[in-house]
Amino acid sequence: MENLCQRLNACQEKILDYYELDSNKLTDQIDYWKLVRYECAIFYKAREGNMQCINHQVVPSTVVCKQKAWQAIEIHIALQSLINTDYNTEAWTMRDTSYEMYMTEPKHCFKKEGTTVTVVFDCNKENTMDYIRWKYVYYKTDIGWCKGTGDVDAKGIYYTQGAYKQYYVDFKQEAEKYGTGVQWAVHVCGQVICCPEFVSSTCSSNQISTAKTAEPVSNATTQTTEAYVPVGTKETEAPYPGKRRRLSGPDTTVTTVTTVTTAATQPGQSVDYTNNNLHSTSGGHHPGRDTSSDQTVFIVHLKGDTNSLKCLRYRFKKHKGLYCNVSSTWHWTSNDTNQQGIVTITFNSITQRNNFLTTVKIPQSITSTLGIMSL
């Protein structure tokens, strides 16, 4: 018994030395785990001898001794194999080589430089969950240890294994666990990434990417075009046969043909914001302009990335009193495959529109254009 006490004292003294050293060398971490293995062996031997205490310490049960010994052996062997790689010169702290870190997702891998990823389920800020994205992941293969980089997209959190993505957090499964499994939004490093199902309601399938599709969200002032553009909309037949124009997007089910005519205000014309009518001081006739509309509203066109517009439009729900209506994401019909999406917001007055632009923060990546529209 005295022999076990002396050995345990010597072992634990050396363990405390490594705690105080706080080394970042891989060789020191290997020596530390070798001492932990030795400590577990002493406790196991003491339990076999029916010893309840040793050096005023309670001896763990046989099951606990075995479990801790297996953990120490697993980490010790993994570190011994890691020292034979090119990664042995990197900084390895006691935290990096702890068993808890080793068994954190992705399990049985060493990880460094974690970043918190917050996921909001079902558009409910009260229903959130935090996950960790690791910048570097060291994983074991048949040929030895390899180093991959971690990242996050709309599908989940992953690390690279060569040219492949190894997901260790699946947002779809997490959404089914914590919500309805339909909608989720990923917040990481100032970016917002929406799930594909949430985006697809207003985006065509060939414009959706499950990778990093969201633009950085910024509270800076939005670039605003101060040109007032009268826009007339007629839901009748197209003015030119064979050139029918429609709004693109899978959620657009308009059966009537919409012709949008944009015209800058000509010299001699002015916009009267009191009665919302367009006046001409020259008395001339302007073809293509319909001034017989019953109602004219003030609008803001938001133009930018389709996914960013989708996320931004969802945030508008918190400010319903600041606008009248908001459209779905639409595009001009053209041969340009890289065209940006457009969202149109209507207002009752200039004051309401100004209050909206002052209250709602628009990302810098989205351009806003002011104008009026006849309904």
From Swiss-Prot:
Coiled coil: none annotated. Signal peptide: none annotated. Residues 266-283 have a biased composition (Polar residues). It is found in: Host nucleus. GO terms for cellular component: host cell nucleus. Residues 296-375 are annotated as: DNA-binding domain. Its main location: host cell. Keywords: Activator, DNA replication, DNA-binding, Early protein, Host nucleus, Isopeptide bond, Phosphoprotein, Repressor, Transcription, Transcription regulation, Ubl conjugation. Residues 1-200 are annotated as: Transactivation domain. GO terms for biological process: DNA replication; DNA-templated transcription; regulation of DNA replication; viral DNA genome replication. GO terms for molecular function: DNA binding; DNA-binding transcription factor activity; nucleotide binding. There is a cross-link at K303 (Glycyl lysine isopeptide (Lys-Gly) (interchain with G-Cter in SUMO)). Residues 264-292 are annotated as: Disordered. Pfam families: PPV_E2_C, PPV_E2_N. Belongs to the papillomaviridae E2 protein family. HAMAP family: PPV_E2. Binds DNA as homodimer. Interacts with protein E1; this interaction greatly increases E1 DNA-binding activity. Interacts with protein L1; this interaction enhances E2-dependent replication and transcription activation. Interacts with protein L2; this interaction inhibits E2 transcriptional activity but not DNA replication function E2. Interacts with protein E7; this interaction inhibits E7 oncogenic activity. Interacts with host TAF1; this interaction modulates E2-dependent transcriptional regulation. Interacts with host BRD4; this interaction mediates E2 transcriptional activation function. Plays a role in the initiation of viral DNA replication. A dimer of E2 interacts with a dimer of E1 in order to improve specificity of E1 DNA binding activity. Once the complex recognizes and binds DNA at specific sites, the E2 dimer is removed from DNA. E2 also regulates viral transcription through binding to the E2RE response element (5'-ACCNNNNNNGGT-3') present in multiple copies in the regulatory regions of the viral genome. Activates or represses transcription depending on E2RE's position with regards to proximal promoter elements including the TATA-box. This is Regulatory protein E2. The gene is E2.
